[in-house]
A protein has these predicted regions:
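Amphipathic interaction/junction segments at domain boundaries or subunit interfaces
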Residues: 1-82
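Short, hydrophobic/π-rich interface segment
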Residues: 55-115
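Beta-rich nucleic-acid/ligand-interaction surfaces
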Residues: 115-123
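Short beta-strand-to-coil "C-cap" segments at the C-terminal boundary of structured domains/repeats
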Residues: 124-129
Length: 129
């Protein structure tokens, strides 16, 4: 836990990192949706053994999220499994919450492949939502 806090603190204080990842408005920009849908479609072709395979979930007016992803195959889990350190994958998953927080996003997730879920469900909304 102590190392995780050090890593988190380092990211929060890095201005370049903030510029690269953006904020809630840039991440949830509807103009990016067509590109994300294309990425999702192409992921299902499974061109690369250890790549991600995902579905894009659009939040509706009654949902508490704006954008969602269901990952059915995870490159990080695959890499950790191949390298004999699968138990580390669940700790890498925690970084998703750090990154979401840095962008002023609310991330909700109920399961991950790293913790024996059937898929990883990411649901992003604005913290103020």
């Amino acid at each position: 836990e102590e190392c995780f806090s050090l890593y988190k603190d380092g990211l929060y204080n890095n201005k370049l990192f903030h510029m690269v990842i953006g904020n809630a408005d840039s991440y949830l920009d509807e103009k990016k949706l067509p590109g994300r849908k294309k990425w999702s479609e192409e992921s299902h072709l499974r061109r690369y053994k250890n790549d991600w395979v995902l579905d894009i979930i659009e939040g509706g007016p009654n949902d508490d999220f704006v954008l969602g992803y269901d990952y059915h195959n995870c490159g990080i889990c695959n890499l950790c499994r191949d390298e004999g350190c699968f138990e580390l994958a669940k700790y890498l998953c925690r970084m998703d919450f750090v990154l979401a927080d840095m962008m002023d996003l609310k991330l909700t997730r109920t399961q991950t492949l790293a913790e024996n879920g059937t898929y990883c469900d990411f649901r992003y909304g604005r913290k103020s939502q």
